[in-house]
């Protein structure tokens, strides 16, 4: 991957440094995200479904309510319920009423969901090494720090 430069995106007027940086982030996200989607496709998952499974794995046995899952998504979407429906139909998640608060329904990852993630952990680690392995540790740390700083406004 090469950095996005002004000359790659012909415009009538020059881009501001902020616009050039934003465009670079968007193009890079599209490239990396497309490659992730291609890796997940043979495993029957979309990137958002994979993200939900990772979120639920991180939640442990307690699981999470629908709105908590939605708050943690990389790309929040309006229909977390439908996402959870699909994952539950595939046997990768299960939902049950919260015994402490019967108004709440908690989603949990199933053993099949954990097994699917275990299959994918190595696959995606290898992909991320192919995507960004050409950057050294100091560059990766700097990139991570800059992206985190860009999210804080």
Protein language model regions, located:
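N-terminal helix-turn-helix DNA-binding core of bacterial DNA-binding proteins
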Residues: 30, 34-76
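Charged, amphipathic alpha-helical coiled-coil/dimerization segments
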Residues: 4, 85-148
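Short amphipathic alpha-helical segments with heptad-repeat character
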Residues: 22, 26, 30, 74, ...
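Pre-recognition alpha-helix immediately N-terminal to the DNA-recognition helix
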Residues: 20, 24, 31, 35, ...
């Amino acid at each position: 991957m090469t950095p996005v430069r002004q000359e790659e995106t012909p415009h009538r007027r020059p881009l501001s440094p902020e616009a050039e940086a934003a465009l670079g982030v968007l193009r890079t996200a599209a490239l990396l995200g497309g490659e992730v989607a291609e890796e997940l496709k043979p495993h029957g998952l979309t990137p958002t479904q994979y993200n939900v499974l990772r979120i639920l794995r991180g939640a442990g046995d307690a699981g999470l309510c629908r709105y908590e899952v939605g708050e943690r998504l990389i790309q929040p979407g309006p229909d977390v319920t439908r996402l959870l429906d699909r994952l539950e139909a595939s046997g990768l998640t299960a939902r049950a009423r919260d015994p402490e608060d019967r108004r709440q329904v908690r989603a949990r990852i199933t053993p099949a969901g954990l097994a699917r993630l275990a299959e994918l952990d190595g696959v995606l680690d290898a992909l991320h090494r192919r995507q960004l392995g050409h950057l050294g540790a100091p560059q990766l740390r700097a990139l991570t720090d800059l992206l985190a700083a860009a999210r804080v406004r």
